[in-house]
Regions:
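Stable alpha-helical structural segments in soluble proteins, enriched in small hydrophobic residues
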Residues: 30-34, 69, 173-181
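Acyltransferase
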Residues: 160-188
Length: 188
């Protein structure tokens, strides 16, 4: 995804094992379509996890290569926060399938500065996921679909709604990265 003066230009491909071979051509395509060069960017944001080891390695390696070559700062963005960002809600319990009957989860509250973790991101058994007590919360993430038989009976009554289709998304990470750069969180 490309954040350009508040506008997002993005590509979405369900690539599976081919993600590493498609990522750089997609970046090139977005830059070309926007008539902007890599060195003209202010920085590069990437999905810093939690997530699959291979996916994180690809994200970090591509980001490091592009940033080093263009002398740009980078900022990592939480994949769980990107799920929360897609909901449009103010309080979100994000649950992402981690495989092997475990989940990555966190609880986020939106304030004037963006998202604040109420429960820090963690890897846990689905039985360990809890909804914070204060206010109205929604559930989001594919963990509610994959491990719904464990999560839904325990949590559904405490959540205003559940969207089990949401996954980490570059278009949702773009505004999060832009805000992080504005706060001076980029790393050279």
């Amino acid at each position: 995804a490309l954040w350009l003066d508040g506008q997002i230009l993005a590509r979405r491909v369900l690539a599976g094992q081919r993600h590493s071979s498609l990522l750089l051509p997609m970046v090139d395509e977005l830059l070309h379509e926007s008539d902007i060069g890599l060195r003209q960017l202010d920085g590069i944001g990437y999905g810093a996890g939690p997530g699959s080891f291979t996916g994180l390695r690809i994200a970090c390696a591509v980001t490091q290569g592009l940033a080093f070559g263009a002398d740009l700062p980078v900022v990592g963005v939480s994949t769980l926060q990107s799920i929360a960002e897609q909901t449009g809600a103010g309080q979100v319990l994000t649950v992402l399938d981690a495989r092997m009957a475990e989940v990555y989860w966190a609880a986020y509250q939106r304030d004037a500065n963006g998202w604040r973790a109420v429960s820090d991101p963690q890897l846990a058994l689905p039985e360990s996921v809890v909804v914070p007590e204060e206010g109205e919360w929604i559930g989001a993430g594919n963990g509610f679909a994959v491990l719904g038989e464990v999560l839904r009976p325990r949590l559904a009554a405490q959540l205003a709604r559940i969207d089990d289709t949401l996954m980490p998304d570059a278009a949702a990470m773009a505004p999060l990265a832009a805000r992080a750069f504005e706060r001076g969180e980029g790393v050279d």
